[in-house]
UniProtKB/Swiss-Prot annotation:
The gene is hemL. The keyword Flavoprotein does not apply. Its cofactor is pyridoxal 5'-phosphate. Keywords: Cytoplasm, Isomerase, Porphyrin biosynthesis, Pyridoxal phosphate. Its EC number is 5.4.3.8. GO terms for biological process: protoporphyrinogen IX biosynthetic process. It comes from Burkholderia orbicola (strain MC0-3). The modification N6-(pyridoxal phosphate)lysine is found at K265. Belongs to the class-III pyridoxal-phosphate-dependent aminotransferase family. HemL subfamily. Pathway: Porphyrin-containing compound metabolism; protoporphyrin-IX biosynthesis; 5-aminolevulinate from L-glutamyl-tRNA(Glu): step 2/2. This is Glutamate-1-semialdehyde 2,1-aminomutase.
Length: 427
């Protein structure tokens, strides 16, 4: 029995499912999760000492690679000063200034500890600002595990949303309307039917939790216009795509300014940190200035802020995103070429340092299209690549991530492994 298997059996005795976040359990793909012992650059090593090329990177934060020496040094420099204070620090101001500089639509920002906290707080703020209750979200977009966001579409536009998790009361779910991603007609119909009830529309401008699906410019511009027309707050959930698809996030990529933005992952540099921010007039409704309450013992934690601030400084290096985007595109295009050569139906896409792999004839544009991919074939591919020492997301419904340490040699090794994996799939 491998050390991974021993640890997984042991973990299941004291941790539900043996993991602290469901996707880690390998339920979608089968098999035994890899327990990470250490990581460096584009690699990690599991409990059995096997090395893997890592295309998850902690689900996005590790944009400069694992244990970057400057990030490590920044963390080490603050450790001796104290782990947590529950009081303001100068470093909190510095990271807030950096975020506001890089994302111009954010005039003020509040630090939190997780993406779920960021989206949950942004929605409460939008409701407090507008005095309205209804939230609009989109099928396939994931915004954390707050009750009002674990909702799927009803049978028609005017029906109440339905909970997607046990423990979410129907009375909460009914305030959330779920529409099809990238469907402008459905969006216009919804605003026409109850536009004056909508407090906020929350959207991943580049979705990463139904695999990678890009928002179309037409869809995102329609969102911006309709929210402005009806007085609803437009919330861009950039927890995943913020500082991933471009230096200024998806807003810089598309040239669209949100009213509120949720950030996470990259801004913590691998530490637990997230944030939400936006227009000053909206943020002024937060306590202690306004009546919308939000708080957190570990918000602005000095160690997390040190890692995040250094990461934000590193990604501003000239040419950083050009090189990262080119490497990610080389990976996606190369995988598609290897599949084509083997005669395996497959498509791939990339934007910035995010990529998606689809066992389908073309790149999907909605959750419904994603679900038509061949999941069984993806699962086989996943395990073939895992055996080769390449670690992709253990689910057909997750995006992948490239770091600045994924150099040509790493991409070449990945494509060589994929050539063998696709050949096995085609056999």
């Amino acid at each position: 029995m491998s050390n991974n298997q021993i640890l997984f059996e042991r973990a299941q005795k004291t941790i539900p499912g043996g993991v602290n976040s469901p996707v880690r359990a390998f339920r979608s793909v089968g098999g035994t999760p890899r327990f990470v012992a250490r990581a460096q650059g584009p690699y990690f090593w599991d409990a059995d000492g096997k090395q893997y090329i890592d295309y998850i990177g902690s689900w996005g934060p590790m944009i400069v690679g694992h244990v970057h020496p400057e990030v490590l040094s920044a963390v080490q420099n603050v450790l001796a000063d104290g782990f947590s204070f529950g009081a303001p620090t100068e470093a909190e101001i510095e990271i807030a200034e950096e975020i506001c500089k890089l994302v111009p639509s954010i005039e003020q920002v509040r630090m939190v500890s997780s993406g779920t906290e960021a989206t949950m707080s942004a929605l409460r703020l939008a409701r407090g600002f507008t005095g309205r209750s209804r939230i609009v979200k989109f099928e396939g977009c994931y915004h954390g595990h707050a009750d009002s966001l674990l909702v799927k579409a009803g049978s028609g536009l005017l029906t109440f949303g339905n909970p997607t998790s046990a423990g979410v009361p129907a009375d909460i779910a009914k305030h959330t309307t779920v529409l099809e991603y990238n469907n402008v007609a459905a969006l216009e119909e919804a605003f026409g039917a109850f536009g004056d009830e909508i407090a906020a529309v929350i959207v991943e401008p580049v979705a990463g939790n139904m695999n990678l699906v890009r928002g179309t410019p037409e869809f995102l511009n329609a969102l911006r216009a309709l929210c402005m027309k009806h007085g609803a707050v437009l919330i861009f959930d950039e927890v995943m795509c913020g500082f991933r698809v471009a230096l200024g996030g998806a807003q810089a990529y598309y040239g669209i300014a949100a009213d509120l933005t949720c950030l996470g992952k990259v801004i913590g540099g691998g530490m637990p940190a997230a944030a939400f921010g936006g227009r000053r007039d909206i943020m002024a409704h937060l306590a202690p200035l306004g009546g919308v309450y939000q708080a957190g013992t570990l918000s602005g934690n000095p160690i997390a802020v040190a890692a995040g601030l250094k990461t934000l400084q590193l990604i501003q290096a000239p040419g950083f995103y050009d090189a990262l985007t080119a490497q990610t595109k080389r990976l996606a295009d190369g995988l598609a070429a290897e599949a084509r050569a083997a005669g395996v139906p497959f498509a791939a896409d990339s934007i910035g340092a995010m990529f998606g792999l689809y066992f389908a004839e073309r790149v999907p544009g909605s959750f419904a299209e994603v679900t038509k991919s061949d999941v069984e074939r993806f699962n086989r591919f996943f395990h073939l690549m895992l055996d080769e020492g390449v670690y992709f997301a253990p689910s057909a419904y997750e995006a992948g991530f490239v770091s600045s340490t994924h150099d040509d040699a790493v991409i070449d090794a990945t494509l060589a492994a994929a050539r063998r994996a696709f050949a096995a799939l085609a056999a």
